[in-house]
Amino acid sequence: MNPSAPSYPMASLYVGDLHPDVTEAMLYEKFSPAGPILSIRVCRDMITRRSLGYAYVNFQQPADAERALDTMNFDVIKGKPVRIMWSQRDPSLRKSGVGNIFIKNLDKSIDNKALYDTFSAFGNILSCKVVCDENGSKGYGFVHFETQEAAERAIDKMNGMLLNDRKVFVGRFKSRKEREAELGARAKEFTNVYIKNFGEDMDDERLKEWFGQYGAALSVKVMTDDHGKSRGFGFVSFERHEDAQKAVDDMNGKDLNGKAIFVGRAQKKVERQTELKRKFEQMKQDRITRYQGVNLYVKNLDDGIDDERLRKEFTPFGSITSAKVMMEGGRSKGFGFVCFSSPEEATKAVTEMNGRIVATKPLYVALAQRKEERQAHLTNQYMQRMASVRVPNPVINPYQPPPSSYFMAAIPPAQNRAAYYPPGQIAQLRPSPRWTAQGARPHPFQNMAGAIRPSAPRPPTFSTMRPTSQVPRVMSAQRVANTSTQTMGPRPTTAAAAATSAVRTVPQYKYAAGVRNTQQHLNTQPQVAMQQPAVHVQGQEPLTASMLAAAPPQEQKQMLGERLFPLIQAMHPTLAGKITGMLLEIDNSELLHMLESPESLRSKVDEAVAVLQAHQAKEAAQKVVSATGVPTA
C-alpha cells in the first residue's frame, strides 16, 4: 500500500451494492477502524428518501481510504457484499474506456469478488463488477484497471482461458456507439435469414426447397416445440451475402400455404429489443405530440357520472374525440379524461368548466400531463417549499427531516436528552430551562418520521448557560435581545440587553383581525400578558398573538405545533404527527385562527387526511404495477 498515492489526491470512496436499509451510522461503524472520517453520505431519492444503493465515505487521509479499499472491499453489510472503489468525480475519465475491459461467458457462480481476485494479478483495479438482474449473474462483467498496460496484459493472458470450466472472452471495452456502428456494418453483409408466419406443416426439407433456389445454404432449421410441431418460424443461413439479400427481396411478403410470410435479416435478441424500443419511443412521442394541448384531465367527479354524462357536459365547447371516466371494480375513481380535436376548444373548456358544479361537486379541469411532467412539477414544488420553510439555525427544526449526511464533529457531541414524549407529558416539559444552542448539533439519527418533538432541554454549549424565567412564553426585552444576539461569550447584562433591544427593531407580524392584539410595552422584567384573545389547549399555557410575535421565527412553528398536535391527535391518533407537519406549512395567522375555530381546524385536517390517503393509494398502485410489470398510462 502506498500512502502517498499520487493518483488519488482525494480520500473519497464510493461504496456500492448497499442494502436499502444501510444507514450512515452503520457505514461509520464499519469504516471508522480504518481511520478518521470527515463525512458519510448515503444517496437517497429526493422525494421518497429511499436509499439508492450507494454511498460516499470521505476520509481525512488518502492512506486511510486506501487501507479501507484494500481490506474491506466485498465485506458483507446486512447480508450483501459491498463494492468499494475510488470516487471518480471526473466523468470523462470514467467514460473514456482507458484501462476498461469486458468479460463475457462467465459462469453463474462467479461474483464480483471472484472476478476481482482473478484479475487483480495483472494490476491495480479501480472497479470491478459482474452485471446481475433479479435472477443473478447475466454472464458478463467489467474490470477497470488503473493503466491501459494492465488491461492489455489481462486481455492477452485471459482471453480464451477457462474460468470454472467455461471458456471466457476478454476484450477491450467498447462504448454503445462503437458497438452499434459495428452492428450496422455487419448488418449490411448478413448471410443469415429469418422467416416467420409459415404455419405448422413446414419442415426443414420443405423450407430448404423454397430457399435453395437462391444459392448454397449452409444450414436450414425450422424451430419446433416439445412435440415436434413447427412453431411457425425458422432460419436459413446462406454461404454468400448476395444470395441472402436476393432471398429477402424476392420472398418477403409472398404467399406460402395461403399465408403472407415475413423474410428478413436475422437479428440478435439485444439488437431486436433495441429496435423495438426505438419504435415504441417513436410511437409514444407521436402520441404525445398528437394529444398536446387537447387532452383534459377532469377530477372530483360525482360517483354517478359515466362516460356519456362526461361527454355531454363538455360537448358544448367543441368536437370531442374521446371521453373516459376511470373505473375500478365497476365504480368511478372520481376522475377522467376528455380529448378535443383542437387546442382552442380544450382551452375554452378549461376556462368554462374549471370550478363549475356538476351533479354535486365542483370540477377541477386542467390540461392532462404525462407522469414524468407531473413528477417533475411536484418535485419542483417540493424543493421550493423546502427552500421557503428552512431558515438558517444551529438547531434543526423538529418538523423537518434530519440532514442526509453524517458529519463527524471535532468534539464529541453532548448527549441529547430531547426525546419524543407522549402528548400528556408536553405540559410537564414546558417550564424546563432553555439554553442557547449556538454551535451545538443534535444527534443526526433521531427517529423523526411521523412524529413531532415537544419543546425540551437543548444540548449545552460552551457559552454561559442561563435558564429563562419560569413564566412560560412571556418574553421580556432581555429575552428578545439575547435571542437576537447569541454569542459564544457571557450574556450581556440586563441593562445592556434592554438598551440593545431599544435600538433594534422588533419584527412586525400580521395576523387575522380576529386574533390581532395591542402591542405590549417591553421592559426588563418578565410580565404577565394583558387581557387579549388567547388560545387555550388543555394542559398547556394560553397562546396569544403577541406571545407568538415575541418568539424567534424558528420557535413560532414549534409553539403552534405543540398546541395543534393534541387537538389533531384527538381526531386522528395514528396520523397526528404527519397531519401536524403538513398544517404547519400554512401561514401563522391562519394557524392561530384554526386553534380558535374547531370547525376550521377540522376542515383543514380532513383535507390533509384526504391528501395522505390519495398518496398512499398512489403508492400502493405503483407497487402493484411494479410487481406485475404492467406499464401505466
Curated annotation (Swiss-Prot):
Composition bias, Polar residues: 461-471
Keywords, in A-Z order: Cytoplasm, mRNA processing, Protein biosynthesis, Repeat, RNA-binding, Translation regulation
GO molecular function: eukaryotic initiation factor 4G binding; mRNA 3'-UTR binding; poly(A) binding; poly(U) RNA binding
Keyword Acyltransferase: no
Main location: cytoplasm
GO CC, one annotated term: cytoplasm
Function of the molecule: Binds the poly(A) tail of mRNA. Prevents mRNA deadenylation and confers poly(A) stability. Stimulates the translation of mRNAs to which it is bound, acting, at least in part, with dazl.
Family stated for the protein in its record: Belongs to the polyadenylate-binding protein type-1 family.
UniProt note: domains: RRM4, together with the C- and N-terminal regions, is sufficient for RNA-binding. RRM 1 has no RNA-binding activity itself, but improves discrimination between poly(A) and poly(U) in combination with the other repeats.
Protein's UniProt name: Polyadenylate-binding protein 1-B
Record lineage: Eukaryota, Metazoa, Chordata, Craniata, Vertebrata
UniProt gene name: pabpc1-b
